[in-house]
Amino acid sequence: MSLCAMASFSDAHELVEIPVIAAYLHRVIHPAQSQIWAVIRETDSIQRIVYSMANTLLGRMCLSGDVTNLSEKQWQAIDNGIDFYKKAAAVIRDGETMIFGSRQASLRHPSAYQAVVRYTDRQSLVVVHTFENGGGSDVNVPVFPVLMAENQADEPETIDLTGIKVTAVYAEPCSMDKDRISLENGRLKVKLQKDFEAAAILLERKPAVDKTKK
C-alpha cells in the first residue's frame, strides 16, 4: 500500500460479512486507504442502509448502487451517515483499532456481534454490527482501551475517565432509545434488538488536568 493512495478492501460489496472483513483488514491496510463500499439498493430498508453506511466507518467511505432511485427517507439515512462520517474522519485517520465480539467460525456466515473501537487519546469511534442470532446482544466495550489499561495498572489517579461524553450517534432512529446506550466508567454499553443491525457512536474525552500545576 506504500505504492498507492487507496485500494478497494474486497469484492464483497453487498454482503453481510463486509464489517468483519473490513475490520480484520485494519491489520494490513490503513483505514484511510481502505475503500469500503456501501452499495444501496432502492429495495433496501432503513435498517439495511444504516448497516451498509456503518460499514464505511471502518475505512474510506464509497457509495454506489441505485442512488438515483432512492426515496427521500432513504436519502436522509444516507445523508445522516455522511454527516457522521465527517465528524469521525479524524479518528478513522489517526486512531488505533481494537475488535470485540464473538470469534467467527465462518466469515461467510457471521453470527452474534462485532464491535470495533477506533480511538485516539481524545476521540473514540465505536461501530457495532449484529449478525445472525445477534439481536439482543449486550455489547460492553472500553471506549479508550489503552487509557483503561493504564488506569488499572500504575497510577490510576493520573488517568481521568470522567470527562468522556457521547458527541454523535448514527443508527436507525427506532433502534436507539435512550435505555439502549449508556456510558459508565469508561465503558460503553449498547443493545441492538435485531439481527443485522448497526449503530455507530462517537465519543470525546477532555484532556486530563495536570494536578502538578497551580
Give the positions of each predicted feature.
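Aromatic- and carboxylate-lined catalytic core of secreted/periplasmic carbohydrate-active enzymes
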Residues: 59-103
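Structured loops at beta-to-helix junctions and adjacent beta-edge loops in soluble globular domains
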Residues: 59, 66, 129-131, 204
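Glycan-recognition surfaces
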Residues: 1-69
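C-terminal accessory region downstream of the catalytic core in glycan-modifying enzymes
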Residues: 163-175
